[in-house]
A protein has these predicted regions:
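N-terminal beta1-alpha1 ligand-phosphate binding loop
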Residues: 18-37
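Short, surface-exposed acidic/glycine-rich loop or hinge patches that mediate macromolecular interfaces
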Residues: 24-28, 53, 71
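FMN-binding flavodoxin-like domain, especially the glycine-rich phosphate-binding loop
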Residues: 32, 40, 44, 49, ...
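Single conserved hydrophobic/aromatic residue that forms the stacking wall/gate
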Residues: 1-15
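Short acidic low-complexity segments
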Residues: 50-58
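A short, aliphatic-rich alpha-helical micro-motif
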Residues: 6, 59-60
């Protein structure tokens, strides 16, 4: 039964093709990362959206949702996501694949590094979606993060402040992993 479910899930993933990238960005950093990810995934410009524009109709257009946020203050979600999360919680995500990414500062905010990713995960984990793009914590320096579940990040953390030299490689590796999970 377990192998049958795995095979069915793999078949469903292969059928997924329409990807929407949604980001919440105050300073522009998360938007820049979103656009890099979209480019690597061959997502057209028209399928890249600010989280503040999220609607149920827009969610229905996509099989795969790539959601990006920055982390603010004491580990808070970026403002554009508050209404976006409400939309996502009401939407039918049971047949959607969700990949999360986020920007944070592992030096100045080491105890809340990329918590925004974890907040999105917590908000969406009971919606029936399937999360893809889990990332190993190896190679990251931080004290704590709610984005770490069972020893792994539930998405891709990016630190453009202290580790910007690693951003392109991290995106490349993550996107390659996403492509395998989607195809």
């Amino acid at each position: 039964l377990h192998s049958l479910r795995r095979r069915q899930r793999q078949m469903c993933i292969r059928d997924r093709s329409k990807i929407g990238v949604f980001y919440g960005s105050t300073t522009g950093t998360t938007e820049d990362v979103a656009r890099k990810i979209a480019e690597k995934l061959n997502v057209p410009q028209g399928d890249i959206h600010d989280a503040s524009t999220l609607t149920d109709a827009l969610v229905k257009e996509y099989d795969v949702l790539v959601l990006g946020t920055s982390t603010w203050g004491a580990g808070e979600l970026q403002d554009d996501w508050y209404d976006g999360v409400k939309v996502l919680k009401k939407a039918d995500l049971s047949h959607k694949f969700v990949a999360l990414f986020g920007c944070g500062d592992s030096d100045s905010y080491s105890d809340t590094f990329c918590d925004g990713i974890g907040i999105l995960y917590e908000d969406l984990k009971d919606t029936g979606c399937t999360f893809i793009g889990i990332t190993d914590t190896a190679g990251y320096t931080f004290d704590a993060s709610v984005a770490v579940v069972n020893g792994k990040f539930v998405g891709l953390p990016i630190d453009e402040v202290n580790e910007d030299s690693q951003t392109d490689q991290r995106i490349e590796q993550w996107v390659e992993g996403l492509k395998k999970e989607i195809n």
